[in-house]
């Protein structure tokens, strides 16, 4: 039995008083003080971990102003505040103690657009890709690019002055910020924009906080103009935080306070809104993917690409390429980056040309390709091949792979993981190759592996050395390397922070700015935040206050993780290896990962949040001397003793009375998971939440009773076959209003599905496919076996959507094969989802033995529901290991593709069909939609893939009363719009859950693709 974890780091009373008074004064946002909420805000995409005291989620600038006014009260003068948005920072920029002010949950509105003048006004929580999706119909985009664009917010980009691919042409975020609305500590609203110097000087004479700010910045930047110009490096990625260089224009006629706030990392004010310059979308985009025999060759050849007038040159090393090959993303780009025969591709330059003149762009591309061919023939520059990508869809897929590179590095095998701490250094591009050669020599001298990729045109390369932060010696080495890289970048006239901001690296600021200029930064900080209450420890302390700075060797996630025994860390790898990349925060409703995060906007309900909580839970167990691996081994095979039952009843009673246990917070996070498994493939690190969720639930319920609904779900495969013998009787009973009311109130289940009428057995009575014995199958000759297909049943389709199975059997017959319906054998997936892992292992072993026996017959086995079929491949393998055997159950599309391989493609005509894939299917098997389309094409039918996210049903998730609202909300995110837009009778869904959700919400259902094929053939 797991122990009660009764104590978690508490919240000081002053913070609680502040939050209470905040709500009393009309704060309309959310506040959170639970340990789980604070833990999810204690990390970002960096190696650091710092626990805040509380989190607030304002809904408007007025809410932020209320926070700032109340904070200025003397009784709360000791509290500190840190703005936060996407949480994708790689250097702890938004990590701090005190109160976190999170803009991402509610402040995500696009307020206004002016296409004629080319600008847009947004709130700080708007995500970069969200904005570009909105701008696309107007023919615009927000130009600064970054790899985390589908979850990084504009507020975060502004606060770190972010930039990435294309910055040589488009510049940094600050180059596109026309003005901001910022809330100062005290509640004053500061609106910035470029001003004539005379007006700025006049504003500085006002005896107000804003007047003091204008006066300080104006006077310091004017008086120290020459010092600033002399000390700021002449780089595309100029020195940020605070950008003293660009406050005045070159002619000294214009003053813009915006440039001080961009890159300020929340140390000066709360930026709540911004007016942004937007750029016309280029009409033509081309990529030339240039392949090299070494990474050094790729680096040294980059200036040649820039000279060819390319928009950007991105580079990727062999380590990143090889990790991409192992990821789901490679499926989408493999044809665009093919291997060169008899050559090893160890480096890649992705060269983009863009513009409005197609003839001119193609001329430049062709000229480059001619030069590349000359280099290949003469064996110069290490060029071994190239490919041109002319289609926009292909261009976007290549960049999606490149964007995923940073996350893929975290999936490197072993305890040492490539980590960010010196990953955005910038040097003049002409020195980049030599600089990287020395950088690599430094890492090689310590025997470290590393991955490299980046923006070689701008002189920025992302270098992530592999270190084990659970090893104290490697943590020391990380600081040593960091110091060495500071010296190395200075040697080449570069910067340590080229695009990701400073964060915990601000301790190096004096070395880059110089003491005299650093003192000027402190004066600016003092004008905005004299008492050091906004994100203290970052950028610089205010003048006149001897405050410490955050350090590179501050407390890290590894500091906590190393308290967990190595064996436990290894066995719970799925939770331990989350590196915080945050891809699970992807805003796009059509992305399968992560539906619970999308609907709640609560990061507790994301793979990263769940992994964070489980890691802390494991640490707290270790702190109490409890070994979860031993507990798992000691679990009884079946049943529990009366003594244990009494103890669980008592513990559950106390829990219902409000007794605290951190395990309850973890349980709450796990209960929101749909177990769709999208994270297990979509996450670059392959964080498999359903797997460690099941293990947690199994251990949690050693202490607490399981709800009745869990037992009902776990035993569905036992009672469904019995109920299917009299489906009308049971449906009548289930349909009674009283039964449904009792089910919702006392069991916690709603909208219970009805059994199929007639049942599958009734439909197939007397049919040869349902009456073949094992002996009859074994007696078939080789030719007969080659034409026989064994259909594997699953509990949901066979008993609740039997027509699909019956139609598949008929389809198999129509295609000239003999279908055989195998006896039903429980799959066990429902047991796995609810954490009945011992019971699941028994079920899996029994069914695996049966299917292995069938496999020996040498006939293909096929199942129709993707989630259940894929369970045989994934969960069975984890539960049984080698005992699983070698059997293989094919999906319907896999078998059809093979069976129809020799059939020619017919002329496609008629109305299109529309394919809606199951989350588990399309993430585990990304080629499934195309495979289905190819199958339809063989019969002259067109099948279009519809890009949607999760439907919200996910097995029994949508039938649980506590999930009902979220289930319907998830459906509304993407499925409902698609169903309203398309003809229902032409929509097809492979998942039983998906079809049942459509029927529940829309009133009429959709069919399985095999049913449409049967109709087409008829």
Where are these regions (language model features)?
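Mobile "lid/hinge" segments at catalytic clefts and subdomain interfaces of large enzymes
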Residues: 157-159, 163-250, 254-326, 330, ...
């Amino acid at each position: 039995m797991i122990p009660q974890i009764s104590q978690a780091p508490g919240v000081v009373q002053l913070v609680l008083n502040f939050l209470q008074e905040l709500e009393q004064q009309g704060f309309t946002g959310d506040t959170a003080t639970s340990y789980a909420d604070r833990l999810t805000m204690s990390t970002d995409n960096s190696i650091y971990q710092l626990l805040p005291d509380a989190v607030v989620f304002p809904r408007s600038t007025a809410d932020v102003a209320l926070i700032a006014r109340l904070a200025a009260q003397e009784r709360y003068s000791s509290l500190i505040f840190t703005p936060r948005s996407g949480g994708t920072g790689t250097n702890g920029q938004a990590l701090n103690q005190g109160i976190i002010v999170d803009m991402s949950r509610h402040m995500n509105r696009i307020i206004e657009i002016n296409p004629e003048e080319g600008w847009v006004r947004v709130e700080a929580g708007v995500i970069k890709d969200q904005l570009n999706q909105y701008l696309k119909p107007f023919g615009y985009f927000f130009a600064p690019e970054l790899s985390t664009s589908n979850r990084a917010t504009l507020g975060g980009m502004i606060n770190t002055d972010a930039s990435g691919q294309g910055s040589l042409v488009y510049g940094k975020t600050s180059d596109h910020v026309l003005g901001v609305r910022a809330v100062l500590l005290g509640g004053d609203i500061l609106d910035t924009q470029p001003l004539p110097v005379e007006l700025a000087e006049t504003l500085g004479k006002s005896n107000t906080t804003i007047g003091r700010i204008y006066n300080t910045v104006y006077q310091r930047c004017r008086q120290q103009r020459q010092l600033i110009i002399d000390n700021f490096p002449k780089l595309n990625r100029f020195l940020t935080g605070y950008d003293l260089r660009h406050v005045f224009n070159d002619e000294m006629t214009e003053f813009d306070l915006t440039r001080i706030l961009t890159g300020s990392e929340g140390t000066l004010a709360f930026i709540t809104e911004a007016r942004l310059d937007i750029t016309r979308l280029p009409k033509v985009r081309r990529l030339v993917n240039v392949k090299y025999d070494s990474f050094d060759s790729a680096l040294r050849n980059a200036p040649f690409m820039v000279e060819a007038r390319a928009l950007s040159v991105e580079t990727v090393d062999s380590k990143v390429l090889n990790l991409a090959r192992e990821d789901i993303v490679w499926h989408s780009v493999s044809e665009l980056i093919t291997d060169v025969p008899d050559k090893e591709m160890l480096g890649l330059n992705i060269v983009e040309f863009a513009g409005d003149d197609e003839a001119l762009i193609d001329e430049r591309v062709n000229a480059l390709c001619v030069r590349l061919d000359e280099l290949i023939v003469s064996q110069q520059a290490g060029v071994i091949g190239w490919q041109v990508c002319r289609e926009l869809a292909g261009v976007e897929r290549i960049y999606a792979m490149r964007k995923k590179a940073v996350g893929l590095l975290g999936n490197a095998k072993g305890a040492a993981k490539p980590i960010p701490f010196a990953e955005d250094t910038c040097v003049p591009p002409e020195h980049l190759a030599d600089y990287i050669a020395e950088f690599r020599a430094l890492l090689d001298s310590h025997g470290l592996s590393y991955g490299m990729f980046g923006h070689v045109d701008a002189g920025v390369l992302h270098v992530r050395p592999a270190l084990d932060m659970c090893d104290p010696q490697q943590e020391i080495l990380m600081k040593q390397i960091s110091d060495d890289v500071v010296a190395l970048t200075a040697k080449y006239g570069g910067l340590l922070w080229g695009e990701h901001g400073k964060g915990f690296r601000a301790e190096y600021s004096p070395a880059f700015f110089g003491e005299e200029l650093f003192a000027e930064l402190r004066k600016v900080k003092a004008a905005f935040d004299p008492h050091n209450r906004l994100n203290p420890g970052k950028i610089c302390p205010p003048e006149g206050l001897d405050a410490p700075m955050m350090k590179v060797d501050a407390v890290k996630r590894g500091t906590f993780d190393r308290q967990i025994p190595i064996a436990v860390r290894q066995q719970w790898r799925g939770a331990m290896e989350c590196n915080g990349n945050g891809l699970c925060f992807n805003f796009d409703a059509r992305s399968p990962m992560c539906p619970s995060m999308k609907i709640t906007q609560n990061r507790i309900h994301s793979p990263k949040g769940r992994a964070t909580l489980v890691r802390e839970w494991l640490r707290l167990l270790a702190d109490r001397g409890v070994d979860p691996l031993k507990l798992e081994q000691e679990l009884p095979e079946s049943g529990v003793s009366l003594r244990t039952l009494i103890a669980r009843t008592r513990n559950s009673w106390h829990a219902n009375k409000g007794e605290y246990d951190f395990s309850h917070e973890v349980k709450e996070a796990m209960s929101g998971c749909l177990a769709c498994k999208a994270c297990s493939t979509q996450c670059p690190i392959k964080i498999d939440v359903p797997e460690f969720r099941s293990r947690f639930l199994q251990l949690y319920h050693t202490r607490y009773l399981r709800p009745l609904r869990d037992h009902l779900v776990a035993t569905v495969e036992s009672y469904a076959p019995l109920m299917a013998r009299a489906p009308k009787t049971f449906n009548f009973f289930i349909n009674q209003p009283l039964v449904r009311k009792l089910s919702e109130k006392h069991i916690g289940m709603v909208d219970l599905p009805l059994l199929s009428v007639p049942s599958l057995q009734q439909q197939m009575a007397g049919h040869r496919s349902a009456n073949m014995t094992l002996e009859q199958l074994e007696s078939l000759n080789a030719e007969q076996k080659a034409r026989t297909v064994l259909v594997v049943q699953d509990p949901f389709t066979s008993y609740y959507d039997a027509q699909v199975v019956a139609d598949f059997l008929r389809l198999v017959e129509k295609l000239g094969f003999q279908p055989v319906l195998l006896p039903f054998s429980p799959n066990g997936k429902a047991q796995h989802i609810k954490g009945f892992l011992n019971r699941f292992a028994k079920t899996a072993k029994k069914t695996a033995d049966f299917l292995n026996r069938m496999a020996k017959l040498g006939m293909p086995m096929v199942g129709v529901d993707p989630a259940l079929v894929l369970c045989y491949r994934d969960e069975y393998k984890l539960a049984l290991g080698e005992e699983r055997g070698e059997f293989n159950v094919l999906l319907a599309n896999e078998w059809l593709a093979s069976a129809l391989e020799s059939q020619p493609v017919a002329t496609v005509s008629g109305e299109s069909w529309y394919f809606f894939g199951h989350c588990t299917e399309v993430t585990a098997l990304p080629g499934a939609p195309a495979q289905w389309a190819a199958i339809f094409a063989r019969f002259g039918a067109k099948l279009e893939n519809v890009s949607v996210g999760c439907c919200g049903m996910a097995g029994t998730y949508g039938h649980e009363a506590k999930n009902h609202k979220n289930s319907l909300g998830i459906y509304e995110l993407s499925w409902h719009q698609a169903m309203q837009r398309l003809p229902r009778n032409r929509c097809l869904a492979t998942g039983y859950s998906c079809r049942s959700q459509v029927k529940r919400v829309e009133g009429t259902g959709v069919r399985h693709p095999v049913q449409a094929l049967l109709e087409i053939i008829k």
